Amino acid sequence: MIKKVPIVLSIFCFLLLLSSSHGSIPEAFLNCISNKFSLDVSILNILHVPSNSSYDSVLKSTIQNPRFLKSPKPLAIITPVLHSHVQSAVICTKQAGLQIRIRSGGADYEGLSYRSEVPFILLDLQNLRSISVDIEDNSAWVESGATIGEFYHEIAQNSPVHAFPAGVSSSVGIGGHLSSGGFGTLLRKYGLAADNIIDAKIVDARGRILDRESMGEDLFWAIRGGGGASFGVIVSWKVKLVKVPPMVTVFILSKTYEEGGLDLLHKWQYIEHKLPEDLFLAVSIMDDSSSGNKTLMAGFMSLFLGKTEDLLKVMAENFPQLGLKKEDCLEMNWIDAAMYFSGHPIGESRSVLKNRESHLPKTCVSIKSDFIQEPQSMDALEKLWKFCREEENSPIILMLPLGGMMSKISESEIPFPYRKDVIYSMIYEIVWNCEDDESSEEYIDGLGRLEELMTPYVKQPRGSWFSTRNLYTGKNKGPGTTYSKAKEWGFRYFNNNFKKLALIKGQVDPENFFYYEQSIPPLHLQVEL
């Protein structure tokens, strides 16, 4: 008992100092935290307030989009190291009448995981990043604060023929990636990352830790691509690992307009979704100014689950116009291919995947997306190419093939609905130097003009990846925003699954504690239809 006295005094003095120094932090929150951590010295290291030397570094550590560095800051940041810390954070934030924001990797394009227009507590999960791989069971448990790179590295340490169908950006947090769907180069073979979730642990609005069995199948359905932060704090996930061959083949082949790049892109639309599932063939349109002059390129990027000789046969049979040659191809194992598509130089140590900060320069970015149901005309593609060529700051266009496994999964299997009727998706991205603050709106307006340009050529109503959410699409006006109002943006991400998400939200979080600008609103059928 005597040994506990210094600990209790240390915690008491720490919290007393907080209450006297930060009148903006509600006393109810500090009192609750004091009670929850009365004998837990870890509070000294996991609670960060503006007067702490650690506050700014923790806040900025995983802000991937510097557009929001000047946004209103949280009253406090909690960086839990135990699941019980998450429970305490949820209970105390709710009791104090504050909002909570949940951040795993900070890659949210709108910064919604770490900013708010009203006073809030930031729950940063970066210290919850344990990974346990079970090769015999073809599964793994991974905590939400781990990055895609850390997860890939751990899989490769255990097996050269196992993988997971997640994205290519190694610094993205697993929590946000899985709960928003998660697409990558294996989606035609194995579907989305969220299609391969088999269990999860969530802290709900009542502070309870629930697994798949105790949360029930409805909530488990919702968090697999429906935006986990609308329903609770998912602290860990159990996922299914997939098989890959010992060697895969990759290539990136770029063509200018004069080299037939646009004609090849037009042809690609007719074959990409019909190719064998083992072949992922995406296309980008972007400015290659390495020569000093603005030059648009159509870049064909591929991952093939097999060897070069087999890939050449598939391409000769399905897309001979591209003219792929053996010397264009590189053979490597899957983990090195993941590094290749993440932008790491060939031969770089795999240990760089464990670096939580992106190896790429941080730039301001805004993004939108569409799903395409039928090939676009040459006229539409000509207008798109012309727009990209004439814009002073050319957007990046990424076209991702669907088909394969994506066409075999029901549109209601998980919240992500865009399956058999979609042949590919288009992602529009504008990137600029963050020091050019005065031109930010101009760049964002340019993205809006591009979206408007594509409107006649895109099936209506439009659909978008939830992971590319954009507040210009629409947003909640407060925790009282109704389902009928939220449909204006919600159907774009989830189509007819949006109503089911709202009904589940009404069951598990009727008071809408887990609210943010594009969270799922609770739908109570007896009140609102």
From Swiss-Prot:
One of its GO terms (cellular component) is vacuole. Pathway: Alkaloid biosynthesis. Disruption phenotype: Accumulates O-acetylstemmadenine (OAS) at the expense of catharanthine and vindoline. Strong accumulation of stemmadenine acetate. Disulfide bonds join C32-C92. It is an enzyme of class 1 (oxidoreductase). GO terms for biological process: alkaloid metabolic process. It comes from Catharanthus roseus (Madagascar periwinkle). Expressed in leaf epidermis. FAD binds at residues 102-108, 113, 168-169, 173-177, 183, 465. The gene is ASO. Residues 1-23 form the signal peptide. This is O-acetylstemmadenine oxidase.
